[in-house]
Amino acid sequence: RDSFYTKLRELQETKAGKVRIAYFGDSMNDGDYIVQDVRSEFQENYGGEGVGYVAVSSLSAGARGSISHQYSKNWFSQSFIKVKKPMKPFGIDGQVFFAKDPAQAYWVRYKAQSQKHSTLLNNPVLLYGRGNNSKAYVTVAADKDSVSNKSLNPVNLLNTLSLSSHNAKSIQVNFHNADSIPIYGL
């Protein structure tokens, strides 16, 4: 297998392909304090755009400079720090979120900021898990000018749903009848 550095060198020399980097850590990651600078340097030198994965909710959401992140406060969440046997598998950040009460409104809103390489939400995709719910759907508002309903099909351990056909500046996702489905983020 090729090493990480070999892949970076190939990318630098050929200007073709992608190297995806996941960096795990604590609230300094979640708040994007250090990571935004490292990510920006990698993107400047090797290409790429965007901020990467952002969970449904975050204690550091208000502190992020790379993306404006808001969400309804009624999400039920489980974290590997507090729960040893979650209702559904944790996501890549060690959390899982549920819209438990179908009578309530659950939503997330993301807006790209003006930092270099992070001015758009590139190919926004919802990550969600398996559930026994065939009635769930989301209403997606991309850049406030296009609104669409999209069904959730929670058949796999991890499912993806493309939220916009273009790179959007902002996106709001409203969840409907999604009560048994684990939601992870974008």
Write out the residue ranges for each language-model feature.
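N-terminal secretory targeting modules
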Residues: 1-24, 28-185
